[in-house]
Amino acid sequence: MDRRKFLTSTAALASVSLAGQTISAKAQRILDHDSEEYWQTIIDQYEVPDHFINLNAGHWGMMSKPVLDAFIEHTKFVNSHNSQYIGHGVVTDPDARNYGKEYGEILAMLAKRLGVGTDEIVITRNATESMQLLISGYNKLKAGDTVLYTDKAYGTMMVEMRNLKALRGTNVVQLKVPHPATYENQIAVFEQGIKENPKTKLILVTHMSNQTGVIVPIKEIQRMARGCGVDVIVDMAHSFGQYDYDFADLDLDFVGFNLHKWIGAALGVGLMYIKKDRIKDIDKKLSFGPDDNEEIRFRALTGTMNMAIVLSIKDALYFLDDIGIKHIDRRFKALRDQWVKEFLDDDRVDILNPEDDRMHAGLTTFRINAIENARELGKTLYRDYRINTTTIGNLSGVRIAPGLHNSLDEMDKLAAAIKEIASKQ
């Protein structure tokens, strides 16, 4: 779907009986993009159940109505046109759609957004796949080298790092991240880890922790590690699309992204980035000959993917661009602050990411200090208050991950629920 058709579809889907205007047209008239009036026009772009409040957008994001509609049309098209859409070099109709061409257009959109080359990125099925390919494929390790990761990394990535002991013969060290987190101690934990483990060759860094929502100073960590001769693999599953940053300025080498969380594409799509001059440092999954050694796509050969899901990336990017990443960044912080501010001076409740604006977006974990069983707390929130969350058992915490479909009023209801539960302990 091209941008003009997408915007037309958006307006048609969002029509309301307010003076005959469409929501998209109304949104364009509202100059204050921080106002709840403006954000209600965005919320109305989502089909949200009314029998619970969904504050668990961190597992996967919700497609907006225009993106969902486009995805359904993509599915119908791929199904009906079948392998003709691939072409296989035999379809010569000049007007025929071609998946290879459209895939290339989507790569170009993603590359432009990141400020990188299309030959430095490849689409995967999720961030986990991207990260597994990078970690297991990193071929600069030799027996006796050390790799580091922290206790705030994503669980599957921890397992993948531990697997390097059997795969590469490395020593694997887990670092403990201090709480409360500060800008300085998030750098220091890796700096000290490298100092204490002089054979360190690789570290895994999670840009935004799925456990706490803490955003680490990745640019400084990358610079420090590079100065020590240490490579960095970065997990950006939760920061991409939720947090405004200049990716190219970070000067990273190896990164895994998710596109169905905060970007809002259909479920089942991610992205892998390898800096052009580092591609050879990640093993190929399959080789068709010596000439493919320079190509990133041979590091992520997953077989036939769901093409309709891939096509939905373009529609999701259009939708986000109509809002603007700076506005999205501010919105997520506003949603977080709306409930977190109620507990900054409350000794009963611990907020697990700091007030430093550089270190949080929307995703935030809390715990009620009198309750050790996070699962029971999560159950209470859903059973008694109809609030859907996820729990972080090792922290006795409940993670709050609002999406663009959430309102400030829903954050107030969350705060009221936490206060009531805490008062009963």
Please identify what each model-predicted range represents.
Residues 5-425:
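Pyridoxal 5′-phosphate
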